[in-house]
């Protein structure tokens, strides 16, 4: 997917979406490093051999997303509900009997303040472990993603 994006800053957001949406995220060999391929050179060019892993910030970020999904019943089994949807931002809810996670993504180069009823006052971001206060709107920095687990 790194080969077809026109803005490389969207790549981590694509993975946040994949891990936040219902289903099992698929990461093809090399994608965890942001490797690019050229399909016009045929299928083998899309499956290069790597001598050693090329770990980077994207690799670390995908690892955090995987841990967040692994530890969350809502992200694995929860119902889906769209909360906020614009051309460049989305917030959706994943919910089970005992857990609610709000997945928030800002794909814009500008910050975005989302005003919506979160149904809770505080949350913990499952990606970073940082607390989030929903009071006064939720600030989404440019090119950012959050998995806010609402406190009961």
Predicted regions and their residues:
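Active-site and adjacent substrate-binding regions of carbohydrate-active enzymes
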Residues: 1-152
């Amino acid at each position: 997917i790194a080969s077809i994006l026109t803005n490389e800053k969207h790549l981590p957001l694509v993975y946040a979406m994949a891990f936040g949406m219902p289903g099992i995220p698929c990461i093809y060999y090399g994608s965890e490093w942001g490797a690019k391929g050229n399909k016009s050179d045929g299928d083998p060019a899309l499956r290069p051999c790597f001598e050693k892993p090329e770990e980077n910030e994207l690799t670390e970020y995908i690892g955090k997303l995987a841990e967040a999904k692994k530890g969350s019943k809502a992200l694995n089994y929860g119902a889906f509900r769209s909360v906020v949807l614009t051309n460049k931002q989305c917030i959706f809810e994943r919910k089970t009997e005992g857990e609610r996670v709000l997945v928030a993504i800002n794909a814009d180069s500008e910050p975005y303040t989302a005003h919506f009823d979160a149904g809770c006052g505080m949350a913990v971001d499952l990606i970073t472990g940082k607390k989030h206060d929903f009071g006064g709107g939720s600030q989404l920095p440019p090119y950012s993603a959050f998995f806010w687990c609402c406190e009961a």
